[in-house]
């Protein structure tokens, strides 16, 4: 599903790129008719319309969750990566569902969102563990939990915001993928070296 969404976006971007280079052919209009519009204003309207569509697509991409975004590894198929198991994200979705089951929503906890767009972009496009700064909870809003309510799964999430928890899970799952990929490539190199 994510691959088809990525293909649709790719086709849309290619269409926009090609559309700017094409020239619109004017329709034959009877001179003096009330529907006659100068050719230059048609081009301006079309470019404004295309700009609005592009902005909407970009905003829609920003609204999607990281699990919905297509990865470059899944959209590009090369002979080098032909042996990769395409179901490698199954563990990541299990972590995500486990996270959702363990979340406890409390009105006393506030989530601070950083306005630093560079960190946000780095977290989205790079390794989240490199730029992760830890939970951002406002002072005095920590929830006190009695010892009866604490268990091994809930204690690790009690002071984290939802965004922080998701970023941690993404870091874990991408780290597992990276580790598996390193093992696979080193095994391939050893087998090629022995031949």
Curated annotation (Swiss-Prot):
What gene does the UniProt entry assign to this protein? SPACA7
**Which GO cellular component terms are attached?**
acrosomal lumen; acrosomal vesicle; extracellular region
- Give the signal sequence positions: 1-24
Q: What organism is recorded for this protein?
A: Homo sapiens
Which residues lie within the region annotated Disordered? 64-89, 119-158
User: Which Pfam families is this protein grouped with?
Assistant: SPACA7
UniProt-listed GO biological process terms: single fertilization
What functional role does this protein have? Answer: Involved in fertilization. Seems not to play a direct role in sperm-egg binding or gamete fusion.
| Name of the protein in its database record | Sperm acrosome-associated protein 7
Q: Keywords of this protein's UniProt record, alphabetized?
A: Cytoplasmic vesicle, Fertilization, Glycoprotein, Secreted, Signal
- Glyco sites are at 62, 159
Show the InterPro entries listed in the entry.
SPACA7 (IPR029301)
Q: Where is the composition biased (Polar residues)?
A: 64-78
This protein's major location comes to secreted
Compartment(s) = Secreted; Cytoplasmic vesicle, Secretory vesicle, Acrosome; Cytoplasmic vesicle, Secretory vesicle, Acrosome lumen
Q: In which tissues is it expressed?
A: Expressed in spermatozoa (at protein level).
